[in-house]
Amino acid sequence: MTYLLSPDEVAAAYVELRTRVVALLREAGEGVADTPVPHCPAWTVKMVASHLLGLPEDSLGGIKPGDDLDAWTQAQVDRHRNDSLMSILDAWEKMGTTIDPILPHFPVPMNSQFVFDACTHEHDIRAAIGKVGARDSQAVRVAAGFIRNSLSLLPQPEAQELLRVTISDFDFLRSLSGRRSVEQIAERG
């Protein structure tokens, strides 16, 4: 059984997510750029936006994370260190003309992992700036499906047990992406 959505659904979810996050941050304004993002210690909203831009930049540029994920993501942040938040959003939006047509052709499940990462950070930003929303978006469904699919491939009984948990896709995503404490997870069942 696969929990993954179709490549076209995954691609559409990413386009919707990017459009939503760009609009959210444009409305919030440059003033939120230096807002700390509690779920990404040592990162600000601008740094998370730099990573969101860096993902498609690196995908198109053939830059792979290698063994050091922290160095890879830090390079994305460093690349845009001197850019304003608004210029990062402009570049991310413009990137759509190049990446959107090829998204449906990304390898499975890498395409869903791409959306999983972006969706996780959308909600990190939302939490940081106090703008809850998009908890039932297609991107959340893609991200939760990616996690469930990954769990389904593991032989451990605990992984299989997690597949039977009946919480919202949003809570499943936040719990299994390290954004919930043990107490918060217990409260949700």
Descriptions of predicted regions:
Residues 78-95:
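A short, structured beta-strand-centered segment in the mid-to-C-terminal lobe
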Residues 20, 47-58, 98, 120-124:
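Alpha-helical scaffold segments in carbohydrate-active enzymes
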Residues 1-12, 32-41, 64-74, 94, ...:
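Structured surface interface patches that mediate subunit assembly and partner/cofactor docking
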Residues 45-73:
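Conserved alpha-helical segments that form or flank metal/cofactor-binding pockets of metalloenzymes
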Residues 44-45, 84, 168:
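Short, structural beta-strand-to-alpha-helix junction motif
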Residues 24, 59, 102, 128:
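Short alpha-helical functional segments enriched in proximate histidine and acidic residues
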